[in-house]
């Protein structure tokens, strides 16, 4: 079991978002939102050097919150969260411009992705809000 600390950002009165730090070559101080309400993990499409598009990728329109956004699919070869590396992760790719605009109002954190239930389920995640940590099986 891997234990990883997370931070909680309050984006308006009583709307809390747990964030874990991510590392990618050439990117400092980037964060993933732990989003157990998201069925699939999502990554910022603008970070092209950090993923490979699926060969049979098709542009799809998907509801993300109230908005309809273009979605593509791809794979991140390596995902480093905290001090731990997790193998390849299939991801949906969307433009995170609007997400980072909202976060900029309340925080200086750059969001690069949402960790969804696909990842949380496959790693038997346990979120401990009291101690601000997530436990993951590798």
Residue ranges and their predicted role:
Residues 1-138:
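Pepsin/retropepsin-fold aspartyl endopeptidases
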């Amino acid at each position: 079991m891997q234990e990883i600390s997370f931070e909680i950002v309050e984006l308006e009165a009583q709307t809390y978002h747990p964030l874990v730090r991510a590392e990618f070559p050439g990117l400092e101080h980037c964060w993933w939102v732990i989003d157990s309400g998201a069925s699939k993990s999502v990554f910022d499409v603008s970070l092209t050097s950090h993923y490979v598009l699926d060969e049979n990728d098709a542009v799809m329109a998907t509801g993300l919150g109230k908005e309809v956004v273009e979605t593509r699919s791809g794979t991140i070869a390596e995902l480093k969260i905290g001090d731990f590396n997790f193998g390849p992760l299939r991801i949906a790719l969307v433009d995170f411009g609007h997400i980072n605009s909202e976060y900029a109002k309340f925080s200086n954190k750059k969001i690069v992705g949402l960790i969804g239930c696909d990842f949380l389920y496959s790693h038997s995640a346990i979120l401990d809000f009291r101690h601000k940590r997530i436990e993951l099986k590798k």
